[in-house]
Each structure stands twice: as C-alpha cells, then as structure tokens.
C-alpha cells in the first residue's frame, strides 16, 4: 500500500462543493481541449469529480475509462453514475501502471491530483504510452508546491512542474507544455507522436 495514497475512508472530501472554487471542472475541460466522441482514461478517477463532466462533454459517442486502485471510491462513483444516468463511463479497478486497457484505445490519458502519490512514475508513463493512440496526449494535473497548503497534500509531498515535464520528455512524449489551472494546481501535457 502506498502511504501517500488518498485514503478511501476520506472520499467524502473529494465531493466537497467548495472544491469547485479552486478547481472548476470547466476550467480543466477548457485546458484539455477535449472533443465530442473522444475516449479518455481518467486514471485515479476517485469519486468521479472529473470523470462525469468528461463523460458529458465527450457525449454518447465518447467513452470514459474511470480507473482507480481503490474499489471503495469506484463504488461511490458507480452510485453517482446510476443517479445521473450516464452511460459512457466504464469503471476499471486497477493500478495506474497496469490499467488493463487495450493498446492504442485512448486519445487522452489523464491523471488529477495523484502524480505525487505514484511511486513508479516511469511505469505509469510507459502504460500511458501503450494505451494512447498515435497523436494522443497524456495530461497530469497536480498540486503546486509553491502555494500555501490550504487544501491537498503536505507541501513536502508535492512535485514541482519542472520535474513532471522532465518525466514526460524522458518517457518519450513530445511537445510537452505546462500551465496553471485553478488556484493550487499545475497541468502538464505531452503527445505520443507514433
């Protein structure tokens, strides 16, 4: 068990309505430039804070693979799916480095606020490369270490955006870019060219 992993017993915090003030799903969607019909792997999906908005955005021809290593949070996400009548979210109980997804099945491999928890980041990026179709993108959103820790993990656990960018380049992703999203987060993206 990863000691940095967000505890499933605290999953209610993932659905705190105040969260929208500092990380609005609409801002994340705009930054990612998703399109209708796209297939997205939301890795570390948790209770679906972003999975459900992604599902609505990509529409019925799109697909969201909501991947999480904790069955408890996926159970909570399933309840939300049932209540919202969303039909294009598929739950996957798996680790980020072994999602079990088919090769070249996704246009976006997305992770929000889990990068600092991942012990074997290079293995996760290798999995992203396997799962992404040519031209697909990996996107990592995580906590900035240069802001007061009102929310999120301790500053000592946070990762600087430059390290994430370096990891993307080392893993073979091209055209890596970064931006700030919300009050407390950075987002990096890179493209699989082949």
Annotated model-derived regions:
Residues 41-43, 47-98:
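Class I SAM-dependent methyltransferase SAM/SAH-binding core
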Residues 122-137:
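A short glycine-rich, Lys/Arg-flanked "PGG" loop and its adjoining helix->strand segment in the class I
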Residues 171-174, 180-194:
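Core SAM-dependent methyltransferase catalytic element
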Residues 107-120:
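A short SAM/SAH-binding and catalytic strip from SAM-dependent methyltransferases
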Residues 19-39:
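Conserved alpha-helix/loop element of class I SAM-dependent methyltransferases that forms part
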Residues 137-163:
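Conserved class I S-adenosyl-L-methionine
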